[in-house]
């Protein structure tokens, strides 16, 4: 029977956080069948990750994933464990937070005893880049509350813009989850200019299971915006024998990482594409790849596909690059095939020429040798005939 996993954060004790780095983890337990995938910060955190092989016990699988981060970045920066179980269509997110201490600490002890985990977790998400940059759309900042228990299901969410409370947010009814908890989503519509100018948005969550309200704050990342470079890459010739081909869009050299990449076909939005998360490059900018899968026939018929990019540093925040099977591409492929054929023919000609040349040399050498031998024999015979027999002549004179 298909069973969704439960996810538990693995948090170090206070004595394990004094070094230059700290190891955090996620325990994914009680799922069937395999596989599950575990990512950190939606794939943005990839270095220092170790995943322990899954173990089958009592008919269910378990595995753990660990990530090592600098102590200076946690808990000041968010670390999230993302778990996906395709078989049950389950996607879970777990924020790795410090342990919640009990009120009392023994005298002379630097660590509170009996640290416990519990209560809801709260995440805040920025508006989608396309929503924040296109005037025709409405950007929203979203607060997600997870692990709300059945015993204390009531959640109250308050919103603040630059520390001034606002009342324009809407909160959805709580949703039951696979692990017998609830999820609550609250969204705050915002003004484009407020986000672009760096205003600070905060959600404050109250719940009886929390010892104190949880606050999460977000604003537009600071830093000088850098314009992305967009390149489209046609499918390789080797794919043409298959039913589907892959079109690629490389977007590089951009900052900030907030970006939207979509595909269109003849002006209509496509769905069958996948984007990598923005990846931090060595120079501090970001890059990503986007892959669109299409029928080979559509590509061969010359349909026009468009990689559409939205980013704050672009003129009018938007750019497009078209990709289609062009006559030049066909000519290049034809020329390449012709060149391959010509090379094959050339090698055949060269082989025949070398063979004939060697045969000719052997024949000429044989004929020359025969002629030399014949001439030498003739010369010897002539010399023998021309030399007088002096002994006979002397005998006759006597």
Curated annotation (Swiss-Prot):
Single GO cellular component term: immunoglobulin complex, circulating
> According to the UniProt topology, which residue ranges lie Cytoplasmic?
371-398
Q: Identify the SUPFAM superfamilies for this entry.
A: Immunoglobulin
Residues modified by carbohydrate are 179, 322, 332
Name the source organism: Mus musculus (Mouse)
- GO molecular function per UniProt: antigen binding; immunoglobulin receptor binding
The UniProt record lists the keyword Acetylation? no
Region annotation CH2: where it falls in the sequence: 114-223
Spans through the membrane: 350-370
> Could you tell me which InterPro entries the record lists for this protein?
Ig-like_dom, Ig-like_dom_sf, Ig-like_fold, Ig/MHC_CS, Ig_C1-set, Immune_Resp_Modulators
Name under which the protein is recorded:
Ig gamma-3 chain C region
Q: Where is this region: CH1?
A: 1-97
Pfam family of the protein (one): C1-set
The annotated region (Hinge) lies at 98-113
A GO term (biological process) for this protein?
complement activation, classical pathway
Q: Which UniProt keywords apply?
A: Cell membrane, Glycoprotein, Immunoglobulin domain, Membrane, Secreted, Transmembrane, Transmembrane helix
* Ranges where the record places region CH3: 224-327
